[in-house]
Amino acid sequence: MSDEKMDLYLQQGMYGPLETKPDERHLFLGSLRERVLLALTKGQVLRSKPYEKVENALKNSKNITLLINGELQYQSYSPYIQMANRNGVHFKIVSDLQFHTPLGLVIAADIAVNRELIYIQDDIFNRSVLKP
């Protein structure tokens, strides 16, 4: 075994297998862009009235997971957890974030869906650091 292969083998043994598209996974709360059905910024999750588009996506989609940024206060994402429970959708609160992400909520499918428009582009979104 060459030194390069040996080093890679040892690195994976110590730190786990290599991760594909790590920057994308950091942004989308552990998921990949190609799997995202809908994403909200932290500011959008903090909005007092939950988005109907989130409810519709949870109702009308199969094999999805609701990913929630654990940096947010429970009160801000509680309505979305209730929506997920009403519609039988699994959810995860992602709190082991090593990197900052402007996203507060992501609805991700188990397989690639390649949606072009994944953001709700309202005033709150336009004030965020994300650009479509």
Model-derived segments and their meaning:
Residues 51, 77-80:
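Conserved strand-to-helix beginnings and helix N-cap segments that scaffold or border functional pockets
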Residues 39-59:
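Short, composition-biased local secondary-structure segments
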Residues 1-46:
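N-terminal, charge-rich interaction modules
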Residues 81-132:
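Short basic, glycine-rich beta-strand/loop surfaces that mediate nucleic-acid
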